[in-house]
Amino acid sequence: MVIMLIFASSTGTILPSKKAKSMEKDFSIFQGNKLNLKYKRQREEVMQKKHRLIFLATVLAGLILFYFGVDTWMKQKQVQQNQPPPIVIKPVAPVKPKTQESNQTTKKEVKQEEQKKEEPKKMVQKQETQEKREVKKSEKNEVKQTQEKKDVKVAKKVPKTEKKAANLRTYKFQVGAFRYRENAYKMAKIVRSKGFDAQVVKVGSLYRVYAYVKAKNYWEAKREIKKHFKDAIFVRK
């Protein structure tokens, strides 16, 4: 038996039992590692699922919040659009009573009528003052020209035969035009006092005063009339 054991040990027949044990250990280790790997994989899968669930939950929460936020914003916008625009109240000017307006219009009409009535009066007054000035001028000329009157009187004393020989002609001059008859006749009286024949003729709305001058020619007649009436105008027959 001892020899067989020695032979078995020398040949290695006992080795298979050790290998089996070592193989069992290795197998058990391999299985343990395999189980660990499975467990790790399961844990990783669980963690991945958790992460996915968390991500999905956050996305859903964000979508829900976004939806409700947009919904509330849209509602507020619709409410603002549906609200009527603010009414602007403008200040209203105080309405004046009609009585004041009517009084003002009547006053204006009365003033206009008074102005219309006063205008012809003013025109008449201006014409009267102008006529009076002309009469005064003629009277002043009459006072200044007393010496010329004497010369005219001397000329009147010349014999008629000499005048006929000279073939004297009569020239017509206008010495004034007046609106009122009285002023015209006053002027005619002054013309006669100067030694000239005078005539008052109404032409239109004016009374014209004409003086007739006897002289040899036009220039002599003009010289004679201009001595007394500087504004005299020659009138052709």
From Swiss-Prot:
<feature type="coiled-coil region">
    <location>
        <begin position="98"/>
        <end position="157"/>
    </location>
</feature>
<dbReference type="GO" id="GO:0016020">
    <property type="term" value="C:membrane"/>
</dbReference>
<keyword id="KW-1133">Transmembrane helix</keyword>
<keyword id="KW-0472">Membrane</keyword>
<dbReference type="InterPro" id="IPR036680">
    <property type="entry name" value="SPOR-like_sf"/>
</dbReference>
<feature type="compositionally biased region" description="Basic and acidic residues">
    <location>
        <begin position="128"/>
        <end position="155"/>
    </location>
</feature>
<dbReference type="InterPro" id="IPR007730">
    <property type="entry name" value="SPOR-like_dom"/>
</dbReference>
<feature type="transmembrane region" description="Helical">
    <location>
        <begin position="53"/>
        <end position="70"/>
    </location>
</feature>
<dbReference type="Pfam" id="PF05036">
    <property type="entry name" value="SPOR"/>
</dbReference>
<feature type="domain" description="SPOR">
    <location>
        <begin position="165"/>
        <end position="237"/>
    </location>
</feature>
<protein>
    <recommendedName>
        <fullName>Uncharacterized protein aq_1894</fullName>
    </recommendedName>
</protein>
<feature type="region of interest" description="Disordered">
    <location>
        <begin position="85"/>
        <end position="155"/>
    </location>
</feature>
<keyword id="KW-0175">Coiled coil</keyword>
<feature type="compositionally biased region" description="Basic and acidic residues">
    <location>
        <begin position="106"/>
        <end position="122"/>
    </location>
</feature>
<keyword id="KW-0812">Transmembrane</keyword>
<dbReference type="InterPro" id="IPR052521">
    <property type="entry name" value="Cell_div_SPOR-domain"/>
</dbReference>
<dbReference type="GO" id="GO:0042834">
    <property type="term" value="F:peptidoglycan binding"/>
</dbReference>
